[in-house]
Amino acid sequence: MSEKRKIFTIVIGDGAYTSERPYTMLRFAYTAILEEHKVNIFLVEDGIFVGKKNQDPTTYDNVGKWMKDIISEGANVKACGVCMKARGLSEDELLDGIKKTTMNGFVEMCEEADNVLFS
């Protein structure tokens, strides 16, 4: 691990199984946590579906499982409330540990971060 613990804010904007970017970002997040860095994740646009409960893909690695593991390891995960409303996704459809937020919440995540990564 590096000498200074870093804070990463990761923005996921792609849907769960529309590209590999969400999966790659979740793998990065998990690795960063294992190396004792702090991780914030902001789900925006179609990326909100990465945090949806009851995912059951047959031919892809389950990003929902990755998200659960990352949350259990201490990641701070928030989803854009406006994006959720536009797509008809309610808070009770999100995995436990994911909080609905606004752009103000996203700005706070970015302000505390050493690095912000967009996918």
Roles of regions detected by a PLM:
Residues 7, 37-40, 76:
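Residues at the starts of beta-strands that form the adenosine-phosphate
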Residues 57-85:
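A glycine-rich helix N-cap at a beta->alpha junction
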Residues 87-119:
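C-terminal structural segments of small proteins and small subunits
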Residues 22-37, 41:
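Histidine-anchored nucleotide/phosphate-binding helix
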Residues 41-52, 82-83:
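Short, conserved active-site loops that position catalytic residues or coordinate cofactors/metal ions
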Residues 4, 8-23, 50-57:
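Short, glycine-rich nucleotide/cofactor-binding loops
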Residues 29, 64-68, 106-107:
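Short amphipathic alpha-helical segments and helix-helix/interface helices
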Residues 33-34, 71, 110-111:
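Anion (oxyanion) recognition and catalysis
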